[in-house]
Amino acid sequence: MVTTRARLALAAGAGARWASRVTGRGAGAMIGGLVAMTLDRSILRQLGMGRRTVVVTGTNGKSTTTRMTAAALGTLGAVATNAEGANMDAGLVAALAAHRDAELAVLEVDEMHVPHISDAVDPAVVVLLNLSRDQLDRVGEINVIERTLRAGLARHPDAVVVANCDDVLMTSAAYDSPNVVWVAAGGAWSNDSVSCPRSGEGIVRKAPSQEDHWYSTGADFKRPAPHWWFDDATLYGPDGLALPMRLALPGSVNRGNAAQAVAAAVALGADPAVAVAAVCQVDEVAGRYRTVRIGAHQARILLAKNPAGWQEALAMVDKHADGVVIAVNGRVPDGEDLSWLWDVRFEHFEKTRVVAAGERGTDLAVRLGYAGVEHTLVHDTVAAIASCPPGRVEVVANYTAFLQLQRALARRG
């Protein structure tokens, strides 16, 4: 039960949310959460009481894994979740307030907010996906984040930590926790973990097929043996478990997300086979991966926010589609330093015609030129799609370019 003050705070938040909607200023979840938090600073703790909560965090894949975990846990009962990805305090308050009676919760949480959010909601499970630099002007943060996560987990020894053992930094964050479920969820991007986060010495990597395929040359720190892993068709788990897993979402990275989602749900009592069936039904995440008709084109929309995310998203692109559009902005939420474009291997598209789009499409066009990729430049993303031959078009956009495209599509109806 929440206090009288909390009930008043939630009522005020609901009023603010309603006002935001009727005045056309947005869905109102954030402002509703902010108002409630302003009136009662303990509101998040009160809303989290009495629930079994999963906290999901990492640089990439948070929204997708949250959506999959919520689907898997939905087989056990009602689930409160921040499905639209508002992953800081106000968004979490709004999500929990909207589902007051749900005894289960799955919360996507920004990496730096995990410790104090965990202190408030006392999670039963914490899912650690991956850590890499999000923006070049924030490159130093990943080691700080790892240490912050490690310290935060130490305050919750009873939580089950579902950690990606292919990611050096997340493995370090979870390494000292007493209840860890290790998942081999993949770690194709290794540029941000060349040194051991514990000793500063080098990390040696072997082929993934070999045992201990990464280890530190300094501290006694190496890749743990996974409890869960996957291949193209099957998810493997404890005690010889092997379940067919054919996802609606593309890419190896999403099979890794699904493996961690299933492991988290099983930790809370879900039946593994039922959980796998549920995650396989997820076909869209807040507009990502969806296919929309735009005139004579069927456009599939992918989101990429940082070098690691771009590498994964570009790997999902069907190079044999009728058109490929890559849209890049350079606003503050994207990171204004776009030199990361030179870290992404666009050379894979040397036999594919690409349309460079977005406010920083010219920067992208220069990079594509050096990569030997045939390209044209059309700054408006919708116009870029229209410039492609009729048929299927693959669209990859960074954060604000993705939002602009979503708004443009909404206006078109």
Language-model region placement:
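A short, flexible N-terminal coil/short beta segment enriched in small residues
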Residues: 42-71, 246-248, 264-266, 276, ...
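ATP-dependent carboxylate-amine ligase
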Residues: 1-33, 266-271, 277-413
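Buried hydrophobic packing segments
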Residues: 69, 73, 92-96, 258-268, ...
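Short glycine-/acidic-enriched loop or helix-start segments at secondary-structure transitions
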Residues: 91, 116-117, 137-138, 171-174, ...
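Short, surface-exposed amphipathic charged segments that create phosphate/polyanion-binding patches used
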Residues: 96, 142-143, 192-203, 386-394
